[in-house]
Every structure is written in structure tokens, then in C-alpha cells.
């Protein structure tokens, strides 16, 4: 549970999850409801909403968790259509592709990346202050995007 809260903090978000509904199994975290909690005490592979996993001491969020964080207050950027497509293809975001910034603009901070419709596409790290630099310079380094799953398929 600490890993989830720490990750949310890195994005400038606060997340209020009832620890009674969070189940950890093999380093993977799941958010369950009352009905599922009865069954989850037994052996299970997947239940409820998958929130992410801890591997080698590092937390890897799920897109369920990113979508939850995107609904509230957090560091976010909204990108135009072409930048959104390039981002889900694994590319970084140039300043010229950013339409709006909410929250931190500081170098080194993490941001959620949203398309023009408010869909969370993933997250990245600000590599150059969002108020500085040329429009043709990388502003946000891609860390995780929704296209990752498809790129891993063989």
C-alpha cells in the first residue's frame, strides 16, 4: 500500500484508498469490493481492479491506477492529437505538442499524459521545465504508455 501512495505522491496526487479493500498477492496489488473480499482470502490469480506491482523494490503502476489518479488533482499535461499518437508509440513529448499543463512544470517531476478527450495515455518525467526551452525540444520523457502492451506482443 505504501508503494501506491508513494507513486501517487510523485505525480502530485493524493489517493484515498481504504487499506481494508487493498489485497497484496505476490507483490501485486488489487482493489476489491466487499463481495470479492470473501473470495480473495482464498488463493486467486486476479480479482477486482489491478493497481500495479512491486518488482525489485520499484513500483510499476497499472493503467487502472493511472486512470484513477487522472480523475483527481495531479500533475497532468494535455497533448494534441499527433503528440498523443507518438506518445502511445513510445515517443517522448515535445513542447509544441502540449496544449495544457495542470500542476507542476518543474524538471524532474512526473506527469500524467492525457489526450484532448481526457483519456490517460500514460505518464512521463519532465526533462526540461515546461515554461522554458524551444518548442522543438523534448519536454516530457515517456516512462509508460498504453501502447507498451502491444509493443511487447510477439
Cite the ranges covered by each PLM segment:
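Accessory RNA 3′-end/elbow-binding domains used by RNA modification enzymes
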Residues: 1-154
